[in-house]
Amino acid sequence: MTEKRAKFTKMMDGDAEDYSIIAASNADDYNHLADKVLDHLRMLENDYGGFQVDRLTHSLQTATRAYRDGRDDEYVVCALIHDIGDNLAPANHAEFAATILQPFVSEENYWIVKHHGIFQGYYFFEFLGLDKNMRDKYADEPYFESCREFCEKYDQNSFDPNYDTLDLDFFIPMVKELFQKPKRSIYLQS
């Protein structure tokens, strides 16, 4: 069976039937979105970036620490994929991950993921000739303390090859649940 496709070659020539076909196809994308996110997360395996553990293990360890600390599933998934952009968007990995998460998570969790790169810099920027207190420019933001805590409790300490890290299979149900349906999007009617 051939997939239904719009008739137009220029969007300005599309009609209601065309956009109905496209909307149905886009809605079906959510059935596979979690699997795509997980596939990309798996691409971090064996990518050490100079650390003692690979980037996938770091991500799993960050999520494991958040889970064991009693964080809710949304927060744990944010911890899991906070560095998903490390190998595709190394110059802005935090923003990359935050953009993926934004339609599905709270404003606070989005802000944490978006800014964790700068907040994580507190632990190493000085060794690169950068200002370790760069995060202080956000001191008056409502989620400053949440992001600081995320980096301190879960992110900066998750490079331990001896830590009892949960495997990816443990987190798959949480990822699938989170990415089922966006909470907000320009494509959703209010």
Residue ranges and their predicted role:
Residues 1-80, 84-190:
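Metal-dependent phosphohydrolase cores
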